[in-house]
Amino acid sequence: MKHLQAVTAILLIAATGFAADGPCVIPQRGYFRIHVSTGGLFGAFAHDHSIEAQKITGCASVDPANISHSAIKLTFTTADIRVIDPKESAKDRAQVQKTMETEVLKILEYPQVVFESTGIETAGGNQLRVSGNLTIRGKTQPVMIPLTFTRMNDGTLQANGKYSFKQSAFGIKPIQIGGGTVKVKDELETEFEVFLK
């Protein structure tokens, strides 16, 4: 049960305005990363991209008697998301960053991405399934996020997971260039690793 109480905090990334009744994420450790793939006629000649929310903080509100009554809220600012493509030139990376901020995330109009849980359940062993509502660019969709957690020798909890979502579900039109000969795929792959204590 102690494992479950602690791990419910794991998906709280840059949380604000949320009660800290449980363990908290260790700042400046771990990552929250989104992989963006390209397609289209000349998609094979284009670069895939990775973007990352590099500041990870937050805590959980935990019900020790019933894990399903625990709560998770995830909030991080869109302005803190960075393009981390190591193979791109600084100029190209800056252009991708600008496109992401102005056309995809529209950070001035939508400064936050929010995840708020609606249910937590065990999935056997060290697995959890966290259901909730994800809000991007003001549009909310239900999601389910699976995660795996491990207790380290010093008591720190390490958790990681992967999930995917479609940009179009949140009213985002995938970027296209060259008349659609190169375009960003609608589905984005997301992975995270978080440490808390």
PLM ranges: what are they?
Residues A19-K197:
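Low-complexity, acidic/polar, glycine-enriched regions of mature
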